[in-house]
């Protein structure tokens, strides 16, 4: 593992996806992570939408994070509203997986071009923070299925949401049970890998500490509280204050430091050199791009005729891959259009209900008020 960051005036890109059930504090976590109100809290409950279940959406938010040493992080946070609302989340799994793979497809398509696009934007997801409900137990079937399906494509970092709802003993027990489930179901979560022969002792110790912290106990809050003459981010309770940035209360600070500083390069390397390369190999294999060697045992080159045939075949397969990528992109655009249409329909329905409720007020209300005056 390497932690040396290349300085760049443009900044270091980091694409981070946050997944978790409604009510687990995704918005609060993202705002706390970015130290700014990047996303509005949705406190408006609409009864008209309570009975309807919307598919998960993937909503990007972009901001710059400036670290204490002046390093600039070009952060893209991908929020996932509506995840976990449905009883059957199979469709939601597919939407998230399809999004992650579509970013790999974009890179694969760019690599296949003879003339590269100098302004190509690499949107591959470097890490996925998965929020686990603080039930005091281990993983649910939903948690297991999602992490098992996505782990081969993205660095998954499990976290216990709203950890301040558990006592210290409950939290420790919950961590042990979750880790036991991760090991039992062989879920390859991101475990802060290190090379004991090449990495410095300080890096090895840090990685071991972070590995022992999994799953991260997260407390999020963008509220500032005065305590002992100091201003802290936290949550106030009758029995005291839980501080977001206090390592004794929350693992938030350790996670933020790992994402933005100590392990950002490692997340990049694993995404590019392992996860993407695995996907690329699978993609090219299914497209029959991994051709059998046509060089003879004596090591002689192909004949000119065979070379021409091989190049023609490669071009044909390349066109097939590009068409498949374009088709997947069209499907994503169609899904986004359907989601927008659904949102407009729900908004129109809500407005119609509001107008109907006003127009159906009893006439006796206004006449009574008139008589009293």
UniProtKB/Swiss-Prot annotation:
User: Which GO terms label this protein's molecular function in UniProt?
Assistant: GTP binding; GTPase activity; molecular adaptor activity
The Gene Ontology biological process annotation of the record reads: cytoskeleton-dependent cytokinesis; mitotic cytokinesis; protein localization; septin ring assembly
The lineage's top-level taxon is: Eukaryota
Q: Where is this region: G4 motif?
A: 161-164
| Disulfide links within the chain | none
Q: Mind telling me which Gene3D superfamilies this protein's record contains?
A: P-loop containing nucleotide triphosphate hydrolases (3.40.50.300)
Give the main localization category.
cytoplasm
In the record, Phosphoserine modifications are located at 303
Q: Which residues bind GTP?
A: 20-27, 162-170, 235
Of the GO CC terms on this record, one is: mitotic actomyosin contractile ring, proximal layer
A Pfam family hit:
Septin
Q: Which SUPFAM superfamilies match?
A: P-loop containing nucleoside triphosphate hydrolases (SSF52540)
List localization entries. Cytoplasm, Cell cortex
Residue ranges of domain Septin-type G in the record: 10-286
User: Could you tell me which residues belong to the region G1 motif?
Assistant: 20-27
Per UniProt, the keywords (alphabetical) are: Cell cycle, Cell division, Coiled coil, Cytoplasm, GTP-binding, Mitosis, Nucleotide-binding, Phosphoprotein
State the coiled-coil residue ranges. 311-357
**CDD domains, per this entry?**
CDC_Septin (cd01850)
Chain spans, region G3 motif: 79-82
What is the recorded function of this protein according to its Swiss-Prot or TrEMBL entry? Plays a role in the cell cycle. Involved in a late stage of septum formation leading to the separation of the daughter cells.
- Assembly information from the UniProt record: Component of the septin complex composed of two copies of each spn1, spn2, spn3 and spn4.
- What family does this chain come from, according to its entry? Belongs to the TRAFAC class TrmE-Era-EngA-EngB-Septin-like GTPase superfamily. Septin GTPase family.
Q: What is this protein called in UniProt?
A: Septin homolog spn3
**Recorded name of the encoding gene:** spn3
